[in-house]
Amino acid sequence: MLSAQLNFVVTLFGIMASAATLVAAEGNFVATTPVPAEYLVGFETIRESDSQELLRTLVEGEMQGRGTGQEGYLRAARWFATQLESYGFQPAGADGSWFQNVPFIKLATQPADCGFKVGVEEFIGGTAIGISDFAGAFEASLPVTFAVVTTNRPEIAEGTFAGRLLVIQSADRIRWDDAFIVRGKPACVLFVADDGRVRNEAVNESEKTPSSIPVAMVTTAAANALAARCGARADLFSANAPTENVLVSSSQMVQCRLKIERESVDVPNVVSWYPGTDETVRHEHVCVGAHLDHLGLQREELFPGADDNGSGSTAVLQLARAIHANPVKPRRSVLLMAFCAEERGLLGSKYYVAHPLKPVSDMICMLNIDMIGRNEESTSEPASENENTIHLVGSQDHSAAFHEMVRKANESVGFVFEYDEENRVDGRSDHASFSEKGVPVTFLFGGFNPHYHKTTDTMDGINFAKIANAARLDYLVLMMAAEQGRFALDEKK
């Protein structure tokens, strides 16, 4: 009887333990498999309340939107390193540093030194025009052509825009060296962009060659005001992606100017290391990362970047703490990084793979987390339909074995995976830098929403359950991958 009672108690305890692991992903997240016992302690340290506390520090403190090259980003990097040290991680940089400095050229302009006017009236001030990725100073008076183009560019004759200012909006991230622009030969280009990309300061790669023609950015509202003044439609440019090609030329002369100051600066990636327990394979490592930067302060406006990418940075910290708290440590090592300058074109992660602190050949996989704090939302898809969804990007296209491991880990978390954004975003976050080097990758992405690159990307409306569950998922993936080892890459299709 005693033996039977004891067996009953043991069985009951096991049922309760299994139930507890399933409850960890309760609510809209429905876990179907208990968390493996060897990973349970770390898993249970990941809590929504901590997600909220960490994110609040990144968003509402003195980090001022964490703009690359700005003091707020440096504060965030130092704080991030301090957190990692408290979780038992070691610095992975040169000479025991937590940082890998990335060299940049910082570009800056003052509102009084940029703008444009029609005739004698200066109707658009400097807050509406700003620095582009390939900015070059200019001052000129030119006739103007307005262009709205899709990814299927219109046919034009060579030199169509010769001697003209080209004001252009594209359905994709068009550059000055796009074949359409090169063929048109404009004298100067203004790219129409959302407000968050029109900056009075920016950083570029130190070796980046400026464009061969003067280029700048202009807000949608300012571009429409200019179009109206020059006889075109006042709603020619839209916040939505263009669906048809439109070209409108005017003989009206537009005076433009943009003066730029340049200086060399170093901006750090945060780099850390957690040694594996198995001496025979601890040189191999799982990489996990998120970009720490956002848009920062731009023309006296603060872009907080709660979702982009305070949420991913928060999840990475929670994952790090879980690794350290768990009694069973990873066999292989963990390289954990917070990247700078993702918003400037993945520059921090690109610099790392070009100047690795650990051999990239020893990296068995890379886990990237970016924008997992809000529910995807569009005019056709309400946020309420995406409480428990997340885009799983990269793994499906690169390694079936790795993809299956992620799916298996998710059975203990309960995300509903979506795959409809891969073509749109696969090359637009830091995992892409590693994928190009042949590393199996996975990218957790919550989807786009109306607050993307807006001053409204604050703590309001953040889904803390989604942040915590993203951390839980990648914690399990990391621990499982560190145990298993290398994954076969699929042949490119």
Model-flagged regions — what are they?
Residues 321, 449-493:
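His/Asp/Glu-rich mid-to-C-terminal helical/loop segments that flank catalytic regions of hydrolases
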Residues 34-35, 39, 125, 130-156, ...:
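Soluble metallo-hydrolase cores and metallopeptidase-like ectodomains found primarily
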Residues 37-45, 61-71, 146, 167-172, ...:
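Second-shell loop/turn segments in exported
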Residues 7-21:
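Bacterial N-terminal signal peptides
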Residues 24-91, 283-285, 491:
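N-terminal hydrophobic or amphipathic helices/low-complexity stretches enriched
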Residues 46, 50-53, 57, 71-75, ...:
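Extracytoplasmic/secreted proteins, especially bacterial periplasmic and envelope-associated proteins
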Residues 61-165, 176:
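Noncatalytic luminal/extracellular "stalk/propeptide" segments of secretory-pathway proteins
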Residues 124, 215-216, 223-225, 230-231, ...:
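Metal-dependent peptidase/peptidase-like ectodomains
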